[in-house]
């Protein structure tokens, strides 16, 4: 563990939906869903907190969301707007440190260990950042402050929306002991069920197992959870982390024009992409569909979720949404492809049922 490290995790609250409510006062206080049309096999990219009260969450089929809340307002994502707002937020963060690691459009780690701002207080810096984001961008953010990345991330999730949580070396052990195992960074349904089966429900339950035992049960994840349970995370905030993507495309033997036939091919492609993600211990937030026509022109359509995914079923829900907005103009298709980008750090990668940064 590094001495005197001061790490802040900034996490924008319901980012896409909050931007839409900011820009359109008629949406404020209403259940708003950013994503696909419920009548066209779309998926939810994100939703407002008003919509979440109905059990709606990211990657849920839009039709399911509609059934849960028929009065919800559905709108298409405006990715260029979200990217512009993200740059505004990141510019603010960069004023406080030159060690900023964006994880996606709406969250980032900031290492303020050597910062002289706010008399060197990470807590005061986090509060000032939150205040500036609200005044200058018109949005709320949640902040976590701690001495490593794992605890800073857990802290930002603790009091959403518009909250701040500080985890010190003195209170970290108590915080981790009480933390439900499903809240641990990277622990999804599969690992959660495995741990529940051996009597692990909270952080304190992990302390009863040796590193060797956890590795035997969970593989490499076991070593990481062993360290997390003891408040250990030596990863550095990395402003130069390279963004990569994982994808697969197929050139068809014969040009096709039937949508159902395309869906069948995309099902196979998504299986391959999901397999690659699993093999590389990766998952991502952005799903991109590529379509090349028989005149060799091509188009891409993308959707960025507010949680990470790697499972084939979730990927295909997004792909079906994307293909529904492609204008084929009566042209035949000669190539189809799927790419997953905005990849998560290679720590513990597994599907999460809920949003990875919106609680």
From Swiss-Prot:
The keyword Iron-sulfur does not apply. Its EC number is 2.7.7.7. Keywords: Cytoplasm, DNA damage, DNA repair, DNA replication, DNA-binding, DNA-directed DNA polymerase, Magnesium, Metal-binding, Mutator protein, Nucleotidyltransferase, Transferase. GO terms for molecular function: damaged DNA binding; DNA-directed DNA polymerase activity; magnesium ion binding. The record marks 16 as: Substrate discrimination. The active site is at 107. One of its GO terms (biological process) is error-prone translesion synthesis. Mg(2+) binds at residues 11, 106. It is found in: Cytoplasm. One of its GO terms (cellular component) is cytosol. Binds 2 magnesium ions per subunit. NCBIfam families: PRK02406.1, PRK14133.1. Monomer. HAMAP family: DNApol_IV. Belongs to the DNA polymerase type-Y family. This is DNA polymerase IV. It comes from Clostridium perfringens (strain 13 / Type A).
